[in-house]
């Protein structure tokens, strides 16, 4: 057998075993970094870079650093990005333009525009700038509130003879979204039209849409851009839907969504979230449910659950939030956003403030998700609707524990909570403890001072706002004007109006709307009408404010004329508009007209009537004496009538002396709210009118057992710079003797003219022998009569006497005012709980129908 021999090489010829070369080690390290990045392990990639630095290994080029920086930017981990930049300097690698541009983007998105400037200047020294660099620098300035610098960079770019591309145009147009620079944006649009970039790029079109919406507040121009875009995608459609919502056009947002679907585009989670917001705004539960089903079929429901919770909460017309709770309970993982959406949904329903706080406590107790500043803001708003101050203090303790109490939005919510709870001393302490007060802080506290009629402090706050150049907002003046309107201080209102003119806000739409409301509520409807007529740009709030003003003054014909003019000008009414329309019809007895408008709400404008609209219809029928029709109407409502509806009906039962229906209405009220004093008071009055004194006394006794107190009648009048308040039989005023002398004189004179006191309105059983005389004395001491007497001796004869009352004016006072206007030769303007009465020459503007 032949032997097979093997020949081995000599040791000298064997390959030498060697260490890997430095370049091989660098390639391995680079590949390791890239492998970490491809796996989404950013921290692992940066750790590999640190190992290279420790071992003294220098990467071969800038590609690795560029990849690292882009990953840091995508992950928004700017701390790691800055660490990568430090390593870049340490390794002494010369960046190329791509790497420099990534550095500008890093510092731009981290908000450090000064550092981005340094990088951009370095690029100039080394001749590394390109069009992308210029675009990135413009975007940096534009995104960090330095719009003018962005425009300057664009001008410098053009002066160098460089040709802008789509990214460059997009960056400068976004900078022009500030209203101060829209003119520059329009000039840039001219460049776009000439160079053909207008229709070439989706991003350019989107930036133009934003410029017109944010800078000009012009959705019409934004739509023109959208309509001319050659390429549309889900981003452009979603942008238009979102901007519709931001401008307060939810119906248009839904129309855009339907057009998008019909055009064959698939919606994404951002689209659906915006459309759910539109459904929530319109309270269109039917469409919201259809879209919910669509989201389930599309597999997007998990991405829009927070929007669903919000939508179901806002669409609960009957106060039920069961649907939004069901969506929340079905969620596998609850985020801080979903918890906050649910808490906010409960908070916005004032009757469920306790449940909102319980949810907040549940979130804290579970401990899986930490509340953020939005959660605390909603929790504090819920606390503001509760009467127990201890709850608010407990929530505040949780905010301090998490270091969120100093957050501006949380701190402002705390101030708002104290204001709503009428705890102004606590509100002031919270306000003064703020290290940095912003305009919202001032507005919130100022609103509280106005509510509490502390106008001296309110005007001081206004001075501070202007001195600190915080920029007085429309809300600032709205709060001031709302405060003076509530008390009827027309002098203070006129002072604020002069401030508005001085600050150049006389054409500001929200401010003008507040002025219309203020003058209307202060009894100067003609001045309100002048403000309205001088407005160049009126929205639905402007029209509704004017319509409401006419309605409160009893000018039903002017209400209907203004409403028709509003429709002719293409302005769509809202729910508040119809409350004013129905109220106007109610106060002048236009039953058929009221029915017509009630039915047209949904038929013509797709507005579903709410509880307040049904209450207006009940009031309309009751004032016309149609109690049976009103009762049947209540029983056919699509949801259970609330206390407001039954209270309206009960008041009518007292006026029309219908004891049986009155008892039924009172029982309904007490079933809904056992502590509602109006039910006991009205039923007691019904029994008294019927001569059933024992039953009347029994109602008063039950009130006393429950510690329920009837709101006392109070009237007030502004004389000089002071508000003078009067109560029934009030003798506390320094001029009480002169007031009662004038009142005695007036009573004597008006009796000579035919005035007869209506003693049937004194619903007390008196034991005195001279029963009628005592009843007359009680009538003479009503607060509105005292206030009018004071007004006649304290104000100029050339001005109307303006009196305000917190309750409905009684029939006897109403009759007496007509006579007083005759004997005094003065116009008397009286605002009660429901409306204005203009007494002049023995007649009232309400024609005795109120």
Swiss-Prot record:
Instruction: State the Gene Ontology terms under molecular function.
Output: mRNA binding; zinc ion binding
Q: Is Thylakoid given among the entry's keywords?
A: no
Query: What are its GO cellular component terms?
Result: chloroplast
Task: Write the record's keywords in alphabetical order, separated by commas.
Answer: Chloroplast, Plastid, Repeat, Transit peptide
Location comes to: Plastid, Chloroplast
| Organelle transit peptide residues | 1-50
For the region Type DYW motif, give the residue spans.
752-850
A single GO BP annotation from the record?
embryo development ending in seed dormancy
Spell out the InterPro entries in the cross-references.
DYW_dom (IPR032867), E_motif (IPR046848), Eplus_motif (IPR046849), Pentatricopeptide_rpt (IPR002885), PPR_At4g14850-like_plant (IPR046960), TPR-like_helical_dom_sf (IPR011990)
What function does this protein fulfil? May play a role in embryogenesis.
The entry sums up its family as follows: Belongs to the PPR family. PCMP-H subfamily.
Q: Give the protein name, as stated in the record.
A: Pentatricopeptide repeat-containing protein At3g49170, chloroplastic
Which organism's genome codes for this protein? Arabidopsis thaliana
């Amino acid at each position: 057998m032949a032997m097979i021999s093997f020949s081995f090489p000599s040791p000298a010829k064997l390959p030498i075993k060697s260490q890997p070369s430095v370049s091989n080690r660098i390639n391995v390290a680079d590949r390791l970094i890239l492998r970490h990045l491809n796996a989404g392990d950013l921290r692992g990639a940066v750790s590999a870079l640190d190992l290279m630095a420790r071992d003294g290994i220098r990467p071969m080029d800038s590609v690795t650093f560029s990849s690292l920086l882009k990953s840091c930017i995508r992950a928004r981990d700017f701390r790691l990005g800055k660490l990568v930049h430090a390593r870049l300097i340490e390794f002494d690698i010369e960046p190329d333009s791509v790497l420099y541009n990534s550095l500008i983007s890093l510092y731009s998105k981290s908000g450090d525009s000064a550092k981005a400037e340094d990088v951009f200047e370095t690029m100039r020294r080394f001749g590394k700038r390109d069009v992308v660099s210029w675009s990135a620098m413009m975007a940096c300035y534009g995104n960090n509130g330095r719009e003018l610098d962005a425009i300057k960079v664009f001008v410098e770019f053009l002066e160098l003879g460089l040709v802008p591309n789509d990214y460059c145009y997009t960056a400068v147009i976004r900078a022009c979204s500030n209203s101060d620079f829209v003119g520059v944006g329009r000039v840039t649009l001219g460049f776009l039209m000439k160079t053909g970039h207008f229709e070439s790029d989706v991003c350019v079109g989107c930036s133009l849409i934003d410029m017109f919406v944010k800078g000009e507040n012009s959705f019409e121009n934004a739509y023109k851009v959208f309509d001319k875009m050659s390429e549309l995608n889900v981003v452009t459609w979603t942008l238009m839907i979102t901007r519709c919502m931001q401008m307060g056009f939810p119906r248009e947002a839904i129309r855009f969504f339907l057009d998008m679907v019909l055009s064959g585009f698939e919606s994404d989670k951002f689209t659906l979230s915006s459309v759910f917001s539109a459904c929530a705004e319109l309270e269109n539960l039917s469409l919201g449910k259809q879209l919910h089903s669509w989201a389930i079929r599309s597999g997007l429901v998990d991405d829009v659950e927070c929007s669903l919770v919000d939508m179901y909460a806002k669409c609960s017309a009957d106060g039920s939030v069961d649907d939004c709770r069901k969506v929340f309970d079905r969620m596998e993982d609850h985020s801080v956003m979903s918890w906050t959406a649910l808490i906010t949904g409960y908070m916005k329903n004032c009757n469920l403030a306790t449940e909102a706080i319980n949810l907040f406590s549940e979130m804290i107790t579970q401990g899986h998700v930490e509340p953020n500043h939005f959660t605390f803001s909603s929790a504090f708003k819920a606390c503001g609707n509760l009467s127990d101050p201890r709850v608010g203090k407990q929530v505040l303790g949780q905010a301090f524990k998490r270091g969120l109490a100093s957050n501006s939005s949380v701190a402002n919510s705390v101030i708002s909570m104290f204001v709503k709870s009428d705890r102004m001393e606590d509100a002031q302490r919270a306000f003064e403890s703020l290290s940095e007060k912003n305009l919202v802080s001032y507005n919130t506290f100022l609103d509280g001072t106005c509510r509490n009629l502390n106008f001296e402090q309110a005007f001081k706050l206004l001075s501070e706002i202007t001195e600190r150049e915080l920029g007085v907002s429309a809300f600032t003046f709205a709060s001031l004007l709302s405060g003076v309107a509530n008390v009827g201080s027309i002098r203070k209102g006129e002072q604020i109006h002069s401030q508005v003119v001085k600050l150049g806000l006389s054409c500001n739409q929200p401010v003008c709307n507040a002025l219309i409301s203020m003058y209307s509520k202060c009894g100067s409807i003609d001045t309100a009408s002048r403000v309205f007529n001088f407005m160049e740009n009126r929205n639905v709030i402007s029209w509704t404010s004017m319509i409401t003003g006419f309605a409160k003054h009893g000018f039903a014909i002017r209400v209907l004329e203004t409403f028709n003019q509003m429709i002719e000008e293409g302005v769509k009414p809202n729910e508040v508009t119809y409350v004013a329309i129905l109220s106007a019809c109610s106060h002048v007895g236009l039953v058929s007209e009221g029915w017509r408008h009630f039915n047209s709400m949904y038929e013509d404008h797709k507005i579903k009537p709410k509880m307040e609209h049904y209450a207006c219809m009940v009031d309309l029928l009751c004032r016309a004496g149609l109690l049976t029709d009103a009762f049947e109407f209540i029983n056919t409502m699509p949801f259970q009538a609330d206390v407001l509806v039954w209270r309206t009906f009960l008041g009518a039962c007292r006026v029309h002396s219908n004891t049986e229906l009155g008892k039924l209405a009172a029982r309904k009220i007490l079933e809904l709210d056992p502590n509602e004093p109006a039910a006991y008071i009205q039923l007691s009055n019904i029994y008294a009118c019927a001569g059933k004194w024992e039953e009347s006394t029994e109602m008063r006794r039950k009130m006393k057992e429950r510690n329920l107190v009837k709101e006392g009648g109070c009237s007030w009048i502004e004389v000089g710079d002071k508000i003078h308040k009067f109560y029934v039989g009030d003798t506390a005023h320094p001029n009480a003797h002169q007031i009662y002398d004038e009142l005695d004189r007036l009573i004597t004179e008006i009796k000579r003219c035919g005035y007869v006191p209506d003693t049937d309105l004194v619903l007390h059983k008196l034991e005195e022998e001279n029963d009628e005389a005592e009843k007359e004395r009680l009538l003479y001491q009503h607060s509105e009569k005292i206030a009018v007497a004071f007004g006649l001796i304290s104000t100029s004869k050339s001005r109307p006497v303006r009196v305000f009352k917190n309750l409905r004016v009684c029939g006897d006072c109403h009759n007496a005012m007509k006579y007083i206007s005759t004997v005094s030769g003065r116009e008397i303007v009286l605002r009660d709980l429901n409306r204005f009465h203009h007494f002049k020459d023995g007649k009232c503007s309400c024609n005795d129908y109120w």
